[in-house]
Amino acid sequence: MTTTTSRLDAQIEKHLGLIDSLSARFALPLHVFFVEEMEANAEAFRSVAAAQYPRTAIAFAVKSNPCRGAVRLAARFGLGADVASEYELQLALEEHMEPATILCNGNAKSDDYLARAVSAGCPIAVDNADELDALDALLRGTGRKAQVLLRFRGMPLAGLTSDDQTTAADWTKFGFHIDEAPALFARLAEAATLRFLGISAHIGTQIAEPGGYERLLDHLLDVARDAQSRGLDVEMIDVGGGFPVSFLSEDEWTAFQASLLARLRGDVGASGAVTWNDIPMGYARTAGDQDSTWIGKAYWSRVPIARMYQHLLCAITRNGRSVVERLHALGDPTLVIEPGRSLMANAGITLTEVMGVKRVLEHAVVSLDMGINNHGTNLISPDIFPAAVLPRRESDVPETAFLAGRLCFSGDMISKAKVKLNRLPRRGERFVLYHTGAYSADHFASNSCGFPRPAKVAIRPGGTAELWRAPETYGSVHGASAEDLTIRDV
């Protein structure tokens, strides 16, 4: 147990009988979410907003856990939604979220997505000029207007984190460059089919240090002021999400970084490897030397979850005023935040079964009855998730191990960083991965190697459960052997 898993361990202990029953009914692997933990995270954001900037709108990033159960909870907790497709939009509307609280995002919105957003009256974060043209063509002559924000990139955020984690610097597929703002504002001021609501940007994901957020907000507030100076009303500023979660404790995180850096510099031998095949993760070589600067996904933050938002509202910007003071000067626009990982990650676990343990170059490798398609964030960047063998025993002797998946390709590693386990397991023992409530179950989920996707269940505080996704079966994935595959009437 680490300090970051103590709450989840308490939930497992509290609901152990129910978890056993759910595991027997739906089989392993099994994604389990705890409603109480998600609600605590939502309440933390609501409390910060109420105390420091009540004109905050909290929009749950549906892509972090795209299922009806999670969206229904978000609606019950009084949240809106950040949606990234027409299907997420439909889900949010079906769960009775107010259209004005559903932010429609995405860099490649279909005509259908745009039409649905306009019909419902949802704000649209416009990504590019073609989207503006598409909206204009859709609405020309109707007397109606689309509610739009302009999404921007090009803020000075280079070196903040790895390229696959940031979405507001220069090298990103999202948004207009901030240099385009004056021309865009001029177009919106004259548009007959577009109603300007405000501006938008999204810094990225799992941003552990506040400095990048401070730079982003500083520039966004400047852009908002420029829009006002050109006669536009700025009713809304959407700063996105990316609020961090501490997967590890501070001591665990700094120890991992120190061990990895020592290995990459050659200070320790092969037995001291802490990543698979010595992948550098957030470290990079420069001019032939091993740089000691970590640029990549971080697994601990001094201001996790809602504490990051609290810090940002109080942050002092370049002109010497706090973010809240500058918002007041702009007329108190609605400030939209889009938490996803920070609401869901530490509300979930994944249970699976151990298939075997072997040694590879002196290192323990635990093979699990799940694949990277059930833990998809690893396909973006190598992740570090705490894990344990169940049940825990007083006689446990801690060991470190790499975690391997069951898919038939060598990149299927559940953890390319060595994970500290309470003991080395045996085949057939139950195994838990912590903090898998966001993205893991759904991001890149697939039927690789013919495996069905596992069930997702949620446990309520009172000890009852919800089925968030039924487990797929052989038949639902592959069909029946007698099925006629001919396409007719085409």
Named regions from a protein language model:
Residues 64-66, 87, 108-110, 128-130, ...:
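Active-site-proximal loop/turn and secondary-structure-junction residues that shape catalytic pockets
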Residues 43, 47-51, 140, 144, ...:
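Generic secondary-structure signature for well-ordered alpha-helical cores
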Residues 156-345, 451:
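Active-site loop/helix belt of alpha/beta enzymes
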Residues 1-147, 191, 195, 229, ...:
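A charged N-terminal "starter" segment
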Residues 57-59, 78-80, 101-103, 123, ...:
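Structural preference for beta-strand elements that scaffold enzyme active sites
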Residues 18, 269-490:
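Charged (often Lys/Glu-rich) extended helix/loop segments that serve as interaction or gating elements
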Residues 70-73, 92-95, 135-140, 161-163, ...:
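Distinct, well-ordered alpha-helical segments
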